Amino acid sequence: MIIKLSIEKGLSECTDFNKVLMFIQPLKLKLIETKTLEYLYSLISKKFKIKKSFLLYTEDGYAIPPSEEGSILKEIDKTFKVLKLNKVKKNEKTDDSGDDLMETDSDNKNKSSESDSSESDSSESESDSSESESESESNETSENESSSSSEPESSLAKKKLLIQQLKRDFQLKEKLQQEQQKQKEAQKPKEKPQQQQQQQQQQQQQQQQQQQQQQQQQQQQQQQKQKQKQQKQQIEQQHKKPPQQQQQQQQQQQQQQQQQQQQQQQQEEVPIGIDDVLTNFSYTISYDNIDELLVEEEKIKRKELEQKKRKLQSQLDNDGLANKNDNNSNNNNYNNSNNNDSNNNNTNKPLSKRQKKLLKKQQNSSQIKENYTINAINNKNDNSTNDSNNNNDNNNNNKNDTNDSNNDDNNNDKKKNNNYSTFKDLTIPNVNDKIAFQKHILLDYVLTVSEYLEGRIEKIDSDILYIRLEPGFDDFEFLDNEFFEESGALGVPVKSLISPKLISDNN
């Protein structure tokens, strides 16, 4: 049976396997570093599922054993031939065994029928097979000698060489197999005690793991029991609370409700200011309009302060001293009550930006009223000469107050209008650095007026700076309250700072 095989598609399947003979062109045998003949033998045995020994031959009839050094296979012809060999029975002649290797398919089919009968004797020992092979080879030599008259001498010489090579190859294979069996038998007793030790170690490890798991389960159960006990104790303690604690809780709840109501009232009373307009509609306002709003806001504030002072002075001049005392006392009590309420609110919760502004305005107005009432009482008890002096003193005090306020405004204006371009740009912020940054950092737009705030860095948390603002720079009209911490520091991301400057302590 002749089988044509393709290396690309893989070796074709066969149903009946004996010793395989393969013809390879001698031109395809070249030296290479990777693919050896051993690799080719193993590939054929795996693909054809051949467990018995076989040999490869060239077209000239030379055997190529796998152990031969120097003959290394680079590539095989895509259409090489594989022939099935017939085993030789004992004491039988094989006249056509060597000659029929290159014959037609019909001769090979006849030989395949003979190979079926020879498979029954394949289970004999290696010694018997070697004897039979030697006898068959001797028979083949005798037959070849008898047929030498018809064939040329060159073919006889080739056959003799083939027979000699076959003998050598089979002898080498038998020796290799015997050595491999000896090595396996020598390794078996050594492997057994090692396997026993490994099994014992594995059993010990499994036992240890089981013990650890049991201990963990016990610990978990104990922890769960302790938690349940603690929960029961807490529930019992809550039910057994004394009446004093209950009263305190009720009082605290009432105070919280009152504070919430007061905050709601204050928020309702406070009118909508420029801060709300800018924060809510900052994306629709142009730069020029914002500048005008800033200037107008400062003018309005100054006018309101002057009007309040004039009204207070006119009230003191026109009203009677008795009515002034009564009104002042009532106003003082009212202001004190408001101050107490506001202080309570401040202690409980941090004030918002608007509440701070209202408290400052109320405190300033109450202080001015108290000063005028005290002066009026002193004027009533003193003589007319003292009255005139007191009036002069009051006028001087009022002038001083206005001058002080004007001086404060001028100082603030100087600070705001400081030439910050002379300072260095802030590149790497550090704790305790004194810095200046633009006032409008928390809004979505950029002002053309270069207004700055000054402060000192208290803490740096990743990319957020916590800045303590310097006194005189506490005008938070363009800052969002959410960025202020409870400590009063301003938490600002570094990336949101616009043109920050590093101020040296000498300035």
UniProtKB/Swiss-Prot annotation:
Q: Which organism is it from?
A: Dictyostelium discoideum (Social amoeba)
Q: What broad taxonomic lineage does this protein's source fall under?
A: Eukaryota, Amoebozoa, Evosea, Eumycetozoa, Dictyostelia
| Record's compositionally biased regions (Low complexity) | 144-155, 194-236, 243-255, 313-350, 378-409
Q: Where does the source fall among the domains of life?
A: Eukaryota
Name the segments for region: Disordered: 91-162, 174-255, 309-422
Basic residues: bias regions: 351-360
Q: Point to the regions of Acidic residues compositional bias.
A: 116-143
Composition bias, Basic and acidic residues: 174-193
Protein name as it appears in the record: Putative uncharacterized protein DDB_G0274435
In terms of Pfam families, this protein maps to: Coilin_N
